[in-house]
Design a protein with these regions (language model features):
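Nucleotidyltransferase catalytic core that binds NTPs
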Residues: 2-238, 246
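Phosphate/ribose-recognition catalytic cores of enzymes acting on nucleotide-derived substrates
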Residues: 228-282
Length: 282
């Protein structure tokens, strides 16, 4: 695996790769890698001839009270994991490389509507940071495909929309959520949980499944079901940001005609804000 630290060197390498008519798959990450990230690389290997993974802790998507400085930087361990997964190129740019004019002076990409609700409501400006850095990475790499985990479903839809709206040629591919043995969605934030908190966090996925079962059984009072989900998590001791049932395409409140739904939640357990979702067809 080749590790590259600046944009010019990456683009020179990609010119050579494209001269050989090889397809490029991009896996953007912030590092501190876990099994979910590695699954993205594995899926990219299936569909792309050359896989480029990026590690960039993006300051633009950290809000007030979210500690950018203390986000885990584990480059050595991450490189070993990517090499084991047969990643071809690792791109590790600095903040200066990505935001040469500084965070406040550069262009910001904003995806309206989708960015304002759910996690966007609780983390204002977060998705502008995501959209901006993803646009930069797609422009730098000119990847044929880019791979995103469906655990961050709102982010996945936002990226898919910005690619469509900006006429970018990259195909955005969502990859199924990887889970711990207890059902907890894999996340870098799980590292902050104690053994007891990890066990307690099982309630997130079990509550999503509970509400999904009620919908599949024919219940259609979505407001009431959201309240049940919220209360179930709250009763377990979780600090719940939201529990929502939406259509899977635009994250709007579903009508009775909608058949493809998603149940989404964000809840704080111990020090970690955890998100998860469950897609279902009725």
């Amino acid at each position: 695996m080749q590790t590259i630290f600046n944009t010019a060197d990456l683009q020179k390498q990609l010119v050579k790769i494209r001269a050989n008519k090889l397809s490029v798959g991009l896996v953007p990450t912030m590092g501190n890698l876990h099994g979910g990230h590695i699954r993205l690389v594995e899926e990219a290997k299936k569909l792309s001839e050359i896989v480029v993974s990026t590690i960039f802790v993006n300051p633009m998507q950290f809000g007030e009270g979210e500690d950018f400085a203390n986000y885990p930087r584990t480059l050595g361990k991450d490189k070993a994991k990517l090499e084991a997964a047969n990643c071809d190129i690792l791109f590790v740019p600095t903040v200066e490389e990505i935001y040469g004019e500084g965070l406040s002076a550069g262009t910001v990409i904003s995806v309206p509507d989708l960015s304002l609700d759910l996690c966007g409501n609780k983390r204002p400006g977060h998705f502008d940071g995501v959209a901006t850095v993803v646009t930069k990475l797609l422009n730098i790499s000119r990847a044929d495909q880019a791979f995103f985990g469906l655990k961050d479903y709102q982010q996945y839809l936002i990226v898919r929309k910005l690619v469509k709206d900006l006429s970018l040629p990259t195909q955005i591919i969502g990859v199924k959520t990887e889970r711990e043995t207890n059902g907890l969605a894999m996340s870098s934030r799980n590292n902050y949980l104690s053994v007891d908190e990890k066990q307690k966090a099982e309630v997130i996925f079990s509550t999503l499944k509970l509400i999904a079962e009620k919908i599949i059984a024919g219940e259609r009072n979505y407001v009431a079901l959201e309240k049940i989900g919220f209360q179930t998590l709250q009763n377990s001791g979780a600090e719940v940001d939201y529990f929502a049932i939406r259509n899977d395409e635009f994250l709007q409140t579903p009508t009775l005609r909608n058949r493809n739904l998603i149940i989404l939640t964000a809840a704080k357990i111990g020090p970690s804000r955890l998100i998860d979702n469950l897609l279902l067809t009725i």
